[in-house]
């Protein structure tokens, strides 16, 4: 390998020397001429012009003419014309085009002659370089995969997407590498993937992880993302989310809503999708009267006044009849009175005065007369359902 490299260096030095002879390099002259005029004389003229200008203090914005300087300046091109007419074939010291080409051809022929004996060594050198490069890539490949997986597991999504492009094949091999604890990072990564097939493979892997985790929250997050991502490769995703919503609603009716509250606090975008479906019941159905206290307890646990207000609005929509009034079934009277009584504690209008009008509009829905009773009646019922019967 060293022998081949030395040979290449010798050839380059030889070619450089020959080209140096071809192009030539004129030795500096003690006094150069321009059109037969000494350069020094021209420089002295320029210095004289500058000196006179400084002495006369000619303003920059004013034209100042000096006849002697003008004559000297105009004499230069006339001198060049006269000199060229007297020296039409004066050599310039440089080779003609044909001479340069012939010299280069000769130099290249000499180079080719020197190169022939070294072809075998250069071929060996090329093979050795290829082998070392391939060895380096083989050593780099597992390291690259490890960096890719570690960046993905740590939540550095942009870098993980970059490394995914460097992986071979359409499917990213991540099986048996991640745990359910990595699901949140994997969901962010899957959402960012631009290729539909890779995205589908990643969601399939996440689905396996969330099923093995037995975690309702992870299963819900996975179902919400599948239902909202734009990918024609994904199938049966609406059914998956609908099944998840049915399970969450049943748990809510049974006063078990920790998963929903956790999603509302940590994943507000996912919760917004869930909430719309949670309160939207099939036509002709509504929450049972006995489930309303549990639903109100759930709403009270939501993290913001705006979220609690809009959730109460969605609940009342599910309890609104076709004529725009609240249900008038007797079993809902006391439960609705509890909700009306709890409204001031659900939304703090003193801290959020901008919500006052929305609260007033919502409270107006309770003015629907039920069995001849108004909003004020329901707010004054108290905590005992028997009081509504006695009245």
Curated annotation (Swiss-Prot):
One of its GO terms (cellular component) is extracellular region. Glycans are attached at residue 323. It is found in: Secreted. Female salivary gland (at protein level). Female saliva (at protein level). Not detected in female midgut, head and carcass (at protein level). Not detected in male tissues (at protein level). Residues 1-24 form the signal peptide. Disulfide bonds: none annotated. Disruption phenotype: RNAi-mediated knockdown results in increased TNF-alpha/TNF levels at the bite sites in the host. Keywords: Behavior, Glycoprotein, Secreted, Signal. Induction: (Microbial infection) Up-regulated in female salivary gland following infection with P.berghei sporozoites. Required for efficient probing on a mammalian host. Alters the local inflammatory response in the host skin following a mosquito bite by suppressing TNF-alpha/TNF expression. (Microbial infection) Contributes to optimal transmission of Plasmodium berghei sporozoites to mice. Mice that received antiserum against the protein show a decreased parasite burden in the liver after exposure to P.berghei-infected or P.falciparum-infected mosquitoes. Antibodies against the protein are not generally elicited by natural mosquito bites; however, active immunization of mice leads to productive antibody response. Active immunization of mice with the protein results in reduced parasite burden in the liver and reduced parasitemia after exposure to P.berghei-infected mosquitoes. Antiserum against the protein decreases P.berghei sporozoite motility in the murine skin. This is Salivary protein TRIO. It comes from Anopheles gambiae (African malaria mosquito).
């Amino acid at each position: 390998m060293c022998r081949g490299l030395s040979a290449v260096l010798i050839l380059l030095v030889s070619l450089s020397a020959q080209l140096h002879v071809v192009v030539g390099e004129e030795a500096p002259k003690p006094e150069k001429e321009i059109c037969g005029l000494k350069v020094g004389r021209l420089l002295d003229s320029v210095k004289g012009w500058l000196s006179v200008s400084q002495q006369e203090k000619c303003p920059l914005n004013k034209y100042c003419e000096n006849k002697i300087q003008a004559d000297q300046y105009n004499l230069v091109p006339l001198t060049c014309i006269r000199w060229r007419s007297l020296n039409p074939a004066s050599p310039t010291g440089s080779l003609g085009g044909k001479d340069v080409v012939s010299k280069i051809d000769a130099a290249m022929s000499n180079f080719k002659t020197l190169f022939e004996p070294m072809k075998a060594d250069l071929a060996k050198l090329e093979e050795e370089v290829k082998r070392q490069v391939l060895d380096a890539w083989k050593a780099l490949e597992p390291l690259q995969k490890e960096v890719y997986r570690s960046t993905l597991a740590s939540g550095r999504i942009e870098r993980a997407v970059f490394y995914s492009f460097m992986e071979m094949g359409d499917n990213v091999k991540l099986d048996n590498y991640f745990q359910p604890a990595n699901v949140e990072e994997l969901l962010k990564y899957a959402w960012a993937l631009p290729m539909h097939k890779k995205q589908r493979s990643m969601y399939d892997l996440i689905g396996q992880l969330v099923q093995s985790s037995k975690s309702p929250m992870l299963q819900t997050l996975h179902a919400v993302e599948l239902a909202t991502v734009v990918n024609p490769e994904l199938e049966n995703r609406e059914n998956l989310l609908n099944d998840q919503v049915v399970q969450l609603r049943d748990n809510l009716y049974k006063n078990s809503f920790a998963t929903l509250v956790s999603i509302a606090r940590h994943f507000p975008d996912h919760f917004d999708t869930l909430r719309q479906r949670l309160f939207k019941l099939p036509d002709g159905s509504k929450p049972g009267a006995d489930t309303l206290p549990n639903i109100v307890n759930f709403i009270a646990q939501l993290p913001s006044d705006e979220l609690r207000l809009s959730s109460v609005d969605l609940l009342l929509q599910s309890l609104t009849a076709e004529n725009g009034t609240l249900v008038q079934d007797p079993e809902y009277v006391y439960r609705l009175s509890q909700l009306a009584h709890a409204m001031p504690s659900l939304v703090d209008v003193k801290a959020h005065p901008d919500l006052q009008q929305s609260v007033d509009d919502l409270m107006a829905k309770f003015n629907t007369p039920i069995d001849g009773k108004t909003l004020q009646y329901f707010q004054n019922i108290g905590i005992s359902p028997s009081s509504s019967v006695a009245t």
